[in-house]
Amino acid sequence: MTFGTFKLKPKPEHLEGVLNVLAQKIFASPHIIAKESGLSLTAVKCALAQLEQEDQLIIKHQLTSPKLQVALKDKSSDVNISATSDPE
């Protein structure tokens, strides 16, 4: 599990906040999701852990910052995840 395990499930409003941000972006880091949703980083990671457990996330690990980005599976299914080159 990328985001760890939490004893409690995330609050519905936390899940909704995370899903709203991910619906607007192809990939976003947990810090960006927290900033744009107004949630704490812990609340975001708890919601992401739940979504990861439900197999709803695509998780992209990178060597540069941000090291971790996530996207919803159904939204980014047509996106080439391995493409990292800048547009010319």
UniProtKB/Swiss-Prot annotation:
GO terms for molecular function: DNA binding. Keywords: Activator, DNA-binding, Transcription, Transcription regulation. It comes from the Bacteria. The keyword DNA-binding applies. May control expression of its associated restriction-modification system HgiCI. This is Control protein C.HgiCIP.
